[in-house]
Amino acid sequence: RKRPDLPILAVERSNRNDVRVFNMGVDYRGETGNPFWEEMGRKHPKQLVIIPFSSNKETVHFYWNSVGANCITGVYEPFGYTMCETLDRRVPAIVQDIDGPKEICELVMDSVFEYHVDKDFEQDIENFKEAVVRFWDTHPDDRASMANHARTALDGFRPEVIKEEWKKVFSNSEIRAKGQYSLSEIEKRKKQAQQDKGEQLY
């Protein structure tokens, strides 16, 4: 579902020999190895650089500061943690148009490079390549400005904002409850809930 080979194949199809794809977080040097990535390394020695989980923090930090863009390629992302990390680090993002990442950056779509996910993988490679070319054709200063603006997409996920949103949920629930129950019944239900919670803790 992650489709990590998508950027590699797109770069190869572009015929750009000066571009490398870094895959960070692949732990393929364990006891059992990782046949998929070992094969990928053999197939794409010029395009692919693998940064395993076992890398030290300095190495990871170096590559995060060296990459031109982060490619979000999964077809199933319930909540895009990688998307959030990318935005937080102010790294230009090449992102798919699926729920999860799309919902996170929907207010800053003009500041990311979106590509359409197609059921046909060959077309998917082509769509991704088009997004990569748009990234390459964008001036580095504009990329930096876009990445800075894209980070504002995280404002709605900050703890203080989420806390206020939960307050609204509880307040609205109480208002609806007041329309169905008397005040004494609501208080009774609150006390019962607190009592049940106390028994569970005990």
Where are these regions (language model features)?
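Aromatic "clamp/platform" in nucleotide-sugar-dependent glycosyltransferases that forms part
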Residues: 75
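C-terminal alpha-helical cap of glycosyltransferases
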Residues: 134, 138, 156-202
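Nucleotide-activated donor-binding/catalytic signature segment of Leloir-type glycosyltransferases, i.e.
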Residues: 34-58, 69
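A conserved mid-protein helix/loop that constitutes part of the nucleotide-sugar donor-binding site
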Residues: 1-13
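Short alpha-helical donor nucleotide-sugar binding micro-motif in glycosyltransferases
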Residues: 62-67
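Short hydrophobic beta-strand element within catalytic cores of glycosyltransferases
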Residues: 92-95, 99-102
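A short, well-ordered alpha-helix in the C-terminal region of glycosyltransferases
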Residues: 134, 141-156
